[in-house]
Amino acid sequence: MFESISGILTLHERERLCVEVHGIEWEIAVSAYSSAAFGEVGSHVKVFTWLYHREDALRLFGFSNVQERTLFLSLTKVEGIGPKQALKVLSSISSQALCAALDTGDLCALQRIPGIGKKTAQRMLLALKGTLALTDAASCAQSQTDDRAAHPSNLGCAPHAREIEDLVTALVQMGYDRKMAAEVIAQESAALCSVGRSLYEEEATVLKRAILALSIAHPHAVAPAAE
């Protein structure tokens, strides 16, 4: 019903935004990761949205990009995960780390998400493993295009500090040591640069290669999940 809302940001909290559009203020529930992507109060923002409605309530959920919304909707299809729980998941783990955990069948990484027990993690893998790769690539395309248009100097082999930090953070959230993760990501990024390929286009591949490299070189690097 609502694809997105564009307007002036009037409230900016960790998991809640208010956006004014032509004199009407919309309250939007967001993940902590999406919230961090928006600017200061008074700035113009575009929020991708999904409307949750039932007999006694209407609620808008918002996302900084289409990728996160796609993940959110996929999570709500898992038995036992409703919209509120799906948003909590996305506040606890980055989209990159979640996609990687689902794609590689990393049950331990999923169990480290607050509120996700072993049975729910197993249901997530059963429902979503192997289903997000193409969706992830397609939904990332628009946000990557927009980012390249806004920052044309970041093309080619220019430094990708934000993308590198996102990848390192994703690995840390999966239980890997930050220093080891940073070293592997730096190596993979340099390898891409040496053949003239862009990290913008290869982020998901780099994350998978880093997980494989860390698993081989440091098989005990991931801390076991709490019982």
UniProtKB/Swiss-Prot annotation:
Q: Looking at the keywords, is DNA repair present?
A: yes
Q: Where is this region: Domain III?
A: 159-227
Q: Where is this region: Flexible linker?
A: 144-158
Q: Where is this region: Domain II?
A: 65-143
Q: What is this protein called?
A: Holliday junction branch migration complex subunit RuvA
Outline what the protein does.
Answer: The RuvA-RuvB-RuvC complex processes Holliday junction (HJ) DNA during genetic recombination and DNA repair, while the RuvA-RuvB complex plays an important role in the rescue of blocked DNA replication forks via replication fork reversal (RFR). RuvA specifically binds to HJ cruciform DNA, conferring on it an open structure. The RuvB hexamer acts as an ATP-dependent pump, pulling dsDNA into and through the RuvAB complex. HJ branch migration allows RuvC to scan DNA until it finds its consensus sequence, where it cleaves and resolves the cruciform DNA.
Compartments annotated for it: namely:
Cytoplasm
Keywords, in A-Z order: Cytoplasm, DNA damage, DNA recombination, DNA repair, DNA-binding
Highest taxon listed in the record's lineage: Bacteria
Positions of the UniProt region annotated as Domain I: 1-64
Q: What is known of its domains?
A: Has three domains with a flexible linker between the domains II and III and assumes an 'L' shape. Domain III is highly mobile and contacts RuvB.
Record organism: Treponema pallidum (strain Nichols)
Q: Could you provide one GO biological process annotation from this protein's UniProt record?
A: DNA repair
One molecular function GO term is: four-way junction DNA binding
**Whom does it interact with, and what assembly results?**
Homotetramer. Forms an RuvA(8)-RuvB(12)-Holliday junction (HJ) complex. HJ DNA is sandwiched between 2 RuvA tetramers; dsDNA enters through RuvA and exits via RuvB. An RuvB hexamer assembles on each DNA strand where it exits the tetramer. Each RuvB hexamer is contacted by two RuvA subunits (via domain III) on 2 adjacent RuvB subunits; this complex drives branch migration. In the full resolvosome a probable DNA-RuvA(4)-RuvB(12)-RuvC(2) complex forms which resolves the HJ.
Where is it predominantly found? cytoplasm
GO cellular component: a single term: cytoplasm
Is RNA-binding tagged as a keyword? Answer: no
Q: Which InterPro entries match?
A: DNA_helicase_Holl-junc_RuvA_I, Hlx-hairpin-Hlx_DNA-bd_motif, NA-bd_OB-fold, RuvA, RuvA_2-like
**Similarity-based family:** Belongs to the RuvA family.
